């Protein structure tokens, strides 16, 4: 178990540092630290999402029996991804920190003027990103132990499908980068927003009805009978996982309405609702 976790603990922070240093030091680029940090964090999130989605696709398509079939990649990638969620909490804080400095709240050397200011940044970060931080903490403290211990090797198909929920993440990250560089008016931003909306709907919202339908087909039950046929704690867990997805999807839809509504000036992006 430790080998994949150690690998994840090296890969994700290492990729972040490599990207940040490259963007800052290449003579052709010479980016400011704030820009390099924010873009590097988005890059690492996109890479993790692609890896998770690929692993999920391999696992879910390899498991013909949705309960008993196993695939080594399901447990290996779950362990590998745990350090990512810990790293990403810190990476999101760094992004928030640098945005705070850009707004003029830092000292001349780019650091907060006082300890009180530092705590103000921390409080602002936790207030703005509370749901995401809670989500990441739950992944590490709840979902990981459950997937390793409670499942007892069963249900790899469902875990693979859950990993494929990350399909929408690269579109979210690209949208935030485009916003960072004031490209909300471009065709790329609109196409990316539409793809983000579609991928989020299919891979994060409709994922849960699909999993219920898949179990119902396996057990010979109609879809509406599945919730009554499975343990209550499974329904509770699914509801807790679905709730933030519905909230984020609502924000994306609200932003998409503003994006595609004709206006005199460039409108906000659907990604801006999650930034």
Swiss-Prot record:
Recorded hits in SMART domains, A to Z, give: TLC
Naming one, the record's GO cellular component terms include: endoplasmic reticulum membrane
Q: Which UniProt keywords apply?
A: Endoplasmic reticulum, Golgi apparatus, Lipid biosynthesis, Lipid metabolism, Membrane, Transferase, Transmembrane, Transmembrane helix
| One GO term (biological process) | negative regulation of fat cell differentiation
**Species this protein is from:** Mus musculus
- Give tissue specificity per the record: Each isoform has a distinct expression pattern. Isoform 1 is highly expressed in brain. Isoform 2 is expressed at low levels, if any, in all analyzed tissues, with slightly higher levels in testis. Isoform 3 is expressed at very high levels in testis and, at lower levels, in white adipose tissue. In epididymal fat, isoform 3 is expressed at higher levels in obese mice compared with lean mice. By contrast, isoform 1 and 2 levels are significantly lower in obese mice compared with lean mice.
Which EC number(s) are documented for this chain?
A: 2.3.1.-
UniProt superkingdom? Eukaryota
Q: Which reaction does it catalyse?
A: sphing-4-enine + octadecanoyl-CoA = N-octadecanoylsphing-4-enine + CoA + H(+); eicosanoyl-CoA + sphing-4-enine = N-eicosanoyl-sphing-4-enine + CoA + H(+); sphing-4-enine + hexadecanoyl-CoA = N-hexadecanoylsphing-4-enine + CoA + H(+)
Record-annotated membrane-spanning stretches: 130-150, 159-179, 194-214, 232-252
Q: Which residues form the TLC domain?
A: 34-261
What this chain does, per the record? Answer: Involved in ceramide synthesis. In vitro, isoform 3 stimulates the production of C16-, C18- and C20-ceramides, isoform 1 slightly increases the levels of C18- and C20-ceramides, while isoform 2 exhibits only minimal activity. May interfere with adipogenesis by stimulating ceramide synthesis.
State the phenotype upon gene disruption. Answer: Knockout mice exhibit a significant reduction of the cone photoreceptor light responses, thinning of the outer nuclear layer, and loss of cone photoreceptors across the retina compared with wild-type animals. Knockout male mice are fertile.
This entry's Gene Ontology molecular function terms read: sphingosine N-acyltransferase activity
Pfam families on file:
TRAM_LAG1_CLN8
Please report the name of this protein according to its UniProt entry: Ceramide synthase
